[in-house]
Amino acid sequence: MTAQQLWQRYLDWLYYDPSLEFYLDISRMGFDDAFVTSMQPKFQHAFAAMAELEAGAIANPDEQRMVGHYWLRDPELAPTPELQTQIRDTLAAIQDFALKVHSGVLRPPTGSRFTDILSIGIGGSALGPQFVSEALRPQAALLQIHFFDNTDPAGFDRVLADLGDRLASTLVIVISKSGGTPETRNGMLEVQSAFAQRGIAFAPQAVAVTGVGSHLDHVAITERWLARFPMEDWVGGRTSELSAVGLLSAALLGIDITAMLAGARQMDALTRHSDLRQNPAALLALSWYWAGNGQGKKDMVILPYKDSLLLFSRYLQQLIMESLGKERDLLGKVVHQGIAVYGNKGSTDQHAYVQQLREGIPNFFATFIEVLEDRQGPSPVVEPGITSGDYLSGLLQGTRAALYENGRESITITVPRVDAQQVGALIALYERAVGLYASLVGINAYHQPGVEAGKKAAAGVLEIQRQIVELLQQGQPLSIAAIADDLGQSEQIETIYKILRHLEANQRGVQLTGDRHNPLSLIASWQR
């Protein structure tokens, strides 16, 4: 295309909403009008399915559940008065709790105010709160936040060391719908141990965000934790940021959660439009479908040109990949769907992997996220008439142009600033785009059987470990092959070897002797 033709295409496909000052540019995606026309029937089906979902239909057929994250920012959409009241009551309880913490009405037993938050959760129970806290945390935050988002002992130690004596003034939020997520349970037990070692009572500083009636809920009631907030079975982890999962920590940090919900609600209204060209989420889904031929054949690279949006790509990685990465479609046919997502931030990435994006394998499309406001207040001049923010903007435009010149497609999202309203809108935009795309390709975006398969496999490994320890404690040194035979686990010999190696490295009673280059020569014995 000539420069004039490209400009005209930009004008033809530019989406702008004045209420949010939000721009979406898909002009650098290579689809034509014929493709758009061919997709219209699919989109009409997707719009109808989305309307049914919002009305309370069973949109997650595998688990026979409603999907209600859109209700969280507009309770009147919920299909029953009871649900509407429940959503409003939870929000009011979060706001009241945060106010009492900030005012000192709720305080740790030491009598001082809470200084820190330790949020324990994994997956959607961590990625959303981490993204929002990084994007929106005030410079003079009312509390500092830390996360246990794994089951890494060294990671636990690092966070606890950072807290130090402030553990006595730390509010611990444990987030788990079932209360049985192993990583979250482990983090809770680790921090309870740290409290006990310091002679601090845990319950007066503990808050549960969990399903009503769950194991964790019962623990919190029995031990008289400071507070409990609900997680609903109609809200999935990856779409839970605007529930108690994300709103509680955000409110405690002093983030305007009312504005965040309002931004999401505004974007929801825009993305209900049944005209494809007037629906920004549909335009995203259209572009994704075009890029990967409806089969996820190209990766999505997220490039936010703003430090505060650093974690947005990680948040989207789960939202998109866990939702769309499915083996089977709704009819049970094997389809192997999904879109791989990665990214960091601009312009840092221009000094990392953008070289490959421009000149390497063309197996991706990029999404640039542009923020118009550089900072609050004036900027110093770094060159005559040029600021650091001008450089950042120029680098974004230059990278976009350089990719297009080499046949690499891209989308550009532009927001006026990074604030609570805009972050809420971005979350809602991608939630809707994922739902629409899932309908286009005929999959269930709201379950995650692959995650459950990994959990079951891990449980099997731990059961083998228990059997190994019991066998070795009988006192007879054994080869790895002999252990496998004795346990009737010959097909798990590699797993047995790796368990033994891990136990020895952590001085857990196992000693291995023999040639490390040849694991079959190793003899395992129990050291009392």
From Swiss-Prot:
GO molecular function, one term: monosaccharide binding
EC number(s) stated in the UniProt entry for this protein: 5.3.1.9
Active site per the UniProt annotation: E322, H351, K455
Main EC class the enzyme belongs to: isomerase
GO biological process, one term: glycolytic process
UniProt-annotated location(s): Cytoplasm
CC terms in the record's Gene Ontology section: cytosol
Entry annotated with the keyword Isomerase: yes
Pathway(s): Carbohydrate biosynthesis; gluconeogenesis; Carbohydrate degradation; glycolysis; D-glyceraldehyde 3-phosphate and glycerone phosphate from D-glucose: step 2/4
Entry-linked InterPro entries: G6P_Isomerase, Phosphoglucose_isomerase_CS, SIS_dom_sf, SIS_PGI_1, SIS_PGI_2
Sorted UniProt keywords: Cytoplasm, Gluconeogenesis, Glycolysis, Isomerase
Reactions this protein catalyses: alpha-D-glucose 6-phosphate = beta-D-fructose 6-phosphate
Function comment: Catalyzes the reversible isomerization of glucose-6-phosphate to fructose-6-phosphate.
HAMAP family from the UniProt entry: G6P_isomerase
Annotated family: Belongs to the GPI family.
Protein name: Glucose-6-phosphate isomerase
Gene: pgi
